[in-house]
């Protein structure tokens, strides 16, 4: 999450669920991977005249000014702002900010890989899920494959932007089921 936030200068929201948050199980220590690291933070002095939101026209990404960085004084708010970081209520400035955010998401999507399909690349049924449903889905799909059924599974790691190739993967199966384990209301509670 930090690597995405630092690389694309954007907010990242990590979604989880109660089962994942409260479950306990042993796991193998992961092998360190350099690809997990965020790029180093540029703390050099900001060039004279540089604007804190000088968005790149193709990626929407601007150099990140670090608090306390020489020449990097600017305002940070959740409101629409111009390239100099002044709050602005002008529709053109708002549109420019929206476009920059959209370009950042598009740039991120270009770095994502399609979700891995567990089982055959095509078949009768594809079961898709995210979060803690992964283990149950893979276990059920494996049991059905052991019975000779053409069932595969896929696990989504990104919801916005979506990983590329999902539509093409889904088209290779006769049926697709998505699993959502969000239901937790008491059925007797009206």
Q: Where are the predicted features?
A:
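Flexible, low-complexity linker and terminal segments
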Residues: 3-190
């Amino acid at each position: 999450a930090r690597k995405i936030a630092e690389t694309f200068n954007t907010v990242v929201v990590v979604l989880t669920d109660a089962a994942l948050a409260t479950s306990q199980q042993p796991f193998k220590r992961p092998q360190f991977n350099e690809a997990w690291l965020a790029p180093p933070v540029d703390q050099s002095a900001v060039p004279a005249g540089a604007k804190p939101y000088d968005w790149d026209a193709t990626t929407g990404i601007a150099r990140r000014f670090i608090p306390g960085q020489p020449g990097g004084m600017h305002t940070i708010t959740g409101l629409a702002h111009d390239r100099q970081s002044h709050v602005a209520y002008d529709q053109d400035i708002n549109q420019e900010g929206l476009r920059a955010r959209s370009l950042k998401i598009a740039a991120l999507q270009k770095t994502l890989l399609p979700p891995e399909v567990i089982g055959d690349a095509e078949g009768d049924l594809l079961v898709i899920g995210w979060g803690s449903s992964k283990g149950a889905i893979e276990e059920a799909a494996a049991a059905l494959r052991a019975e000779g059924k053409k069932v595969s599974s896929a696990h989504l790691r990104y919801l916005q932007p979506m990983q590329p190739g999902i539509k093409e993967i889904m088209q290779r199966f006769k049926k697709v089921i998505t699993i959502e384990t969000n239901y937790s209301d008491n059925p007797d509670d009206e």
